[in-house]
């Protein structure tokens, strides 16, 4: 898969991934009503970056930027949309390692931001932290099947 696509396209083209997502999002263990709502209303998109070498952040950033532009252009009703970014999982899944992994991921992704703003781990740990790319605010959530928590 080269670009982000709607969850309905995932159903047609990658039924295994669709079933994995459906199983996760409809599970009683998954408490995110927003994600479930996005999934059922067909407002969910997926970008499969699992084949990218060593986290090609520029490609991921470009897809997120394109997704944001697409939603702004076609979202006349001000609905909320979700994009799931599928990446290769880290080798280790301890809580501390995953925390460092997601911090590093966000910091490196932010390096491509057109605003030239930078973030640090200390910024991310602040109560009022908001992650943004090109002045658009994103709510990143890490899903890791091997982690003890379903949503983080």
Task: Enumerate the language-model features and the residues they cover.
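Non-catalytic accessory regions used for complex assembly or targeting
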Residues: 1-76, 88-90, 100-116
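Short acidic, S/G/P-rich loop/turn micro-motifs used as interaction or catalytic elements
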Residues: 53, 90-94, 145-148
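Solvent-exposed loop and beta-edge segments used for protein-protein assembly and interaction
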Residues: 77-79, 134
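Non-heme Fe(II)/2-oxoglutarate
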Residues: 81-84
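A short acidic (Asp/Glu
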Residues: 94-99, 151
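Aromatic/basic-lined ligand-recognition segments
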Residues: 119-152
């Amino acid at each position: 898969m080269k670009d982000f696509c709607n969850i309905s396209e995932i159903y047609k083209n990658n039924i295994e991934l669709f079933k994995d997502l459906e199983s996760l999002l409809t599970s009683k263990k998954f408490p995110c009503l927003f994600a479930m709502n996005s999934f059922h209303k067909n407002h969910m998109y997926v970008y499969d970056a699992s084949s990218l070498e060593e986290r090609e952040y520029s490609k991921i950033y470009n897809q997120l930027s394109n997704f944001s532009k697409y939603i702004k252009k076609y979202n006349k009703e001000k609905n909320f949309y979700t994009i799931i970014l599928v990446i290769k999982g880290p080798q280790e899944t301890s809580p501390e390692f995953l925390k460092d992994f997601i911090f590093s991921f966000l910091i490196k992704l932010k390096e491509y931001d057109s605003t030239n703003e930078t973030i640090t781990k200390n910024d991310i740990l602040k109560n009022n932290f908001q992650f943004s790319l090109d002045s658009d605010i994103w709510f990143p959530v890490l899903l890791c099947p091997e982690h003890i928590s379903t949503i983080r």
